[in-house]
Amino acid sequence: VPDYISAKIMRQLKNGNVYTCMGCRSFLTVEEKQKNPDGSYKFYGRFNQGVVTINLVDVACSSEGDFDKFWEILEDRLELCHRALRCRHERLLGTVSDVAPILWQYGALARLKKGETIDKLLYDGYSTISLGYAGIYEMCMRMYGKSHTDPEVRPFAMKVMQRLNDKCAEWRAAENISYSVYGTPMESTTYRFSKCLQKRFGIIPGVTDKNYIT
């Protein structure tokens, strides 16, 4: 079943803009500093610096269902993700355009000079870097025994998502790097995460009893 994009909703969320995603689901942010010569927002040619995913199921299982512990562990894991994202960003700093002329010199992503670094493209919203998340459903099953779609549980799930978004905004304000929240597609990671969860916590019905997480 393909993913469908609502142009109507996207216009509401993206300042009236409708545009395609990068790959399967990563959408660039609308940036006031990144506009085309005609004044329209720039999307084509921008890029993402990478993703680090937080395993929310692990956070819930590590807390053993204690909400105070959950929020403490979540904060620790978010800081760990931040450090990992910084590693990705810093690995790109100093890269010269010559390593991929089609990307950096001939217009696929930019038109830099030979020998010029890509550093300026890593700031001011030209590129994004993503905090991915996985396991909202299983996280809620561990904490409440119910799905995130349950009216009782939905506020908790939304509070977690808001915290992820707030942390990205905090990091961005401090560093001028466009951190964003991203629903990680998972692909092979879903199996790896599930096996790690089973090894650490055993089989918990509705939480770790599958070879994938949502």
Give the label of every model feature segment.
Residues 1-125, 142, 146-214:
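Conserved catalytic cores of very large enzyme subunits
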